Amino acid sequence: MYISNQIDPEWPRSTGCGPVGAISRATLICNLCALARSRPAMQTLPNSLPTQVTFKGTLEGLRLLIPVALPWEEVVLQLQHRLNAGERLWQGGAVVILEVGERLLDGPQLQAVTEMLTAQQLHLMRVRTVRRQTAVAAAVAGLSVEQQEAPPEENPDKPPALRGLAEPLYLQTTLRSGMSLVHPGTVIVVGDVNPGAEIVADGDILVWGTLRGVAHAGAHGNTRALIFALRLRPIQLRIADRVARASDEPPAAPQPEVAYIQDNTIHIAITTEFARRW
């Protein structure tokens, strides 16, 4: 900003602060006050969306928050700046939970974030997102995923029973050991769920492959939820608050099986028999 040290001799006359001539301190103050009165009042800016990439330390790990509206190029620049800053909130080997909310991220963008974190000896452990596309991209990249529910729709015409239902999450990949997938609806996996992997769903779980990990359907108390797999060999099965595991004796010939609750107990049946019964 440039400020002139000359005072307009017309100001005193126009403001009633004294005759033109030598400028006293009082006259100078009066002139400045007149200038301030002549400027338009500052307006308060409305609340805006977050525009900063931020880290927050928590007990579960280091949360990395990426704003929804920030251009991707700016996300990269800000993240590099935060990671290279002298004062850090972490030590080498810390785990990171990436929180992106409604923002869409594809596979290459997730890979770029992973590589920047890895360069600082940080481990991207989980991605929290509202968007199914981001959840799918993260799972395909081998990352654990927690898909959160979107804000409820303001639609009074929709029946209450249909409001807030999450769409099924469809994945064409294999969940490896250490991966965790959390979704507020039904999960469909075309691939295997290996030992050490976990699926938690509010709805059903369908695995078009071999289920060897942990599966928890109806996680918020839905006792009518089902767990289906072409080969059901899990470490643990959970439906609502019931817990079970597959039999140590595999079927003579591998057949699709389904787990369900009946009489407050988890039962496992061959799919064809279950279909006839239900």
Curated annotation (Swiss-Prot):
One of its GO terms (biological process) is cell morphogenesis. It comes from the Bacteria. Cell division inhibitor that blocks the formation of polar Z ring septums. Rapidly oscillates between the poles of the cell to destabilize FtsZ filaments that have formed before they mature into polar Z rings. Prevents FtsZ polymerization. Belongs to the MinC family. NCBIfam families: minC, PRK00513.2-4. Interacts with MinD and FtsZ. This is Probable septum site-determining protein MinC. Keywords: Cell cycle, Cell division, Septation. Pfam families: MinC_C (PF03775), MinC_N_1 (PF22642). The gene is minC.
